[in-house]
Amino acid sequence: MNAKFILLLLVVTTTTLLPDAKGAEIIRCSGTRECYAPCQKLTGCLNAKCMNKACKCYGCV
């Protein structure tokens, strides 16, 4: 019983700490305009925003 709980806790902790694949490439920015060109190269769309000095690229709708 105790071993199963520890294993479950380990799995949950590991999955929450792993970075997602989409955010693996970090593009630094100081304004949203700096994100348009790099995000267009990655996703093919201009949908982007600068948040916490890193670009957040959104896909095409």
UniProtKB/Swiss-Prot annotation:
Disulfide bonds join 29-50, 35-55, 39-57, 45-60. It comes from Opistophthalmus carinatus. GO terms for molecular function: ion channel inhibitor activity; potassium channel regulator activity; toxin activity. It is found in: Secreted. Expressed by the venom gland. The record marks 49 as: Basic residue of the functional dyad. This is Potassium channel toxin alpha-KTx 6.9. The keyword Iron does not apply. It holds the Pfam family Toxin_2. Belongs to the short scorpion toxin superfamily. Potassium channel inhibitor family. Alpha-KTx 06 subfamily. Keywords: Disulfide bond, Ion channel impairing toxin, Neurotoxin, Potassium channel impairing toxin, Secreted, Signal, Toxin, Voltage-gated potassium channel impairing toxin.
